Curated annotation (Swiss-Prot):
<feature type="transmembrane region" description="Helical">
    <location>
        <begin position="121"/>
        <end position="141"/>
    </location>
</feature>
<feature type="topological domain" description="Cytoplasmic">
    <location>
        <position position="201"/>
    </location>
</feature>
<dbReference type="Pfam" id="PF01098">
    <property type="entry name" value="FTSW_RODA_SPOVE"/>
</dbReference>
<feature type="transmembrane region" description="Helical">
    <location>
        <begin position="355"/>
        <end position="375"/>
    </location>
</feature>
<feature type="transmembrane region" description="Helical">
    <location>
        <begin position="92"/>
        <end position="112"/>
    </location>
</feature>
<dbReference type="GO" id="GO:0009252">
    <property type="term" value="P:peptidoglycan biosynthetic process"/>
</dbReference>
<keyword id="KW-0132">Cell division</keyword>
<comment type="similarity">
    <text>Belongs to the SEDS family. FtsW subfamily.</text>
</comment>
<protein>
    <recommendedName>
        <fullName>Probable peptidoglycan glycosyltransferase FtsW</fullName>
        <ecNumber>2.4.99.28</ecNumber>
    </recommendedName>
</protein>
<dbReference type="GO" id="GO:0015648">
    <property type="term" value="F:lipid-linked peptidoglycan transporter activity"/>
</dbReference>
<feature type="transmembrane region" description="Helical">
    <location>
        <begin position="155"/>
        <end position="177"/>
    </location>
</feature>
<feature type="topological domain" description="Periplasmic">
    <location>
        <begin position="347"/>
        <end position="354"/>
    </location>
</feature>
<comment type="function">
    <text>Peptidoglycan polymerase that is essential for cell division.</text>
</comment>
<keyword id="KW-0472">Membrane</keyword>
<dbReference type="InterPro" id="IPR018365">
    <property type="entry name" value="Cell_cycle_FtsW-rel_CS"/>
</dbReference>
<keyword id="KW-0131">Cell cycle</keyword>
<feature type="transmembrane region" description="Helical">
    <location>
        <begin position="181"/>
        <end position="200"/>
    </location>
</feature>
Amino acid sequence: MRLFKTKIINRPLKLGKKKSSNIHVLYDRIFFWLLLGLIGIGFVIISSGSIPTGMRLANDPCYFIKRVIVYYSVTFLLSVIILKIPIIVWQNYSAIMLLCSCIMLITALILNNSTNGASRWIMWGTLCIQPAELSKLSFICYLANYLERKSKEVCTKFWSICKPIVIMIILAVLLLAQPDFGSIIILFITTLSILFLFGAKLCQLILVFVFNIFLIIPLIVIKPYRIQRILTFWDPWKDPFGNGYQLTQSLIAFGRGKCFGEGLGNSVLKLEYLPEAHTDFIFSILAEELGYFGAILVLFMLFIIVLRAMIIGHRALNINHRFSGILACSISMWFGLQIFINVGTVSGILPTKGLTLPFISYGGSSFLITVMASMQLLRIDFETRLSKNQAFLKCTKI
């Protein structure tokens, strides 16, 4: 953890033992250890839930486990690099990142590597890259940079909020062509929430919301499967072996888990009964094997992750690190919304959406991007605490 240590403390400070030790800690320990804990839980549940699918696809029970280890190794190496990148670099290159994301989305459509009727992936050897995940992070970086530069205009002029909305709509069109309706919802709600949080007028955002709803409704109507998803959501038991199959199997998994679960590795629904058991519906398998108490514990850990991310943003804003603060708050919104949609989907609260559960679901691109965003949060917290410590040392010298 040498990255989070600082050499500016070169003389003892008479602040008491507790404060003296805390001044050396330049990262959020709660966030860091919760992140590791969730990744560990995710690895265990993926290892359990992916065995039947691995046998069916590759005749290898460890097929997905091996791939996860590769993804985790790549993610670890990139995390070390990202922790060393100053946040100002992300701000300066946010527009280029967004442009690259758009190019990758277009490339995915051209290559048309279709899986389950969706063209969302760029194949690179045996690895699959999903540009939609990168587009979330790059757009959030761009939005934070825009709000940092145009903070006064956003509060006073309606047209100032139109530019990020237009760019969001362009991304939404590219995502819809894949199609990836879940990512569109994430971008749409996160954008409106952050604009409101940082000064945009509520009446203007309501106008934008209504306008976009009128755009979205025809897109739902022209695709029969989307209408069917909504109808199935109201009562999946009307068609338990057809359109409601995935949701009913998910609910059965929750019911089997009861309070304390069936035990690790003892899930029955993962045996080809529940589709996407190790990806979008991994929380159902977790609830079946660990029970309601295990599921609630994981939800609590995820909630604290989202809360700590918002606290990191608040600290950065307090010392006028506006880009860092807006970025951290945006990432917190993104994580919280995606967690809510995934858990709501598998528990029957929301219509089904193809969104993974952050840090836990199998998915190389989604896991890599969420961990990258988490490393950005740790870097923001590091720079914030470092600035506070430097200011404190200047005060002690006066």
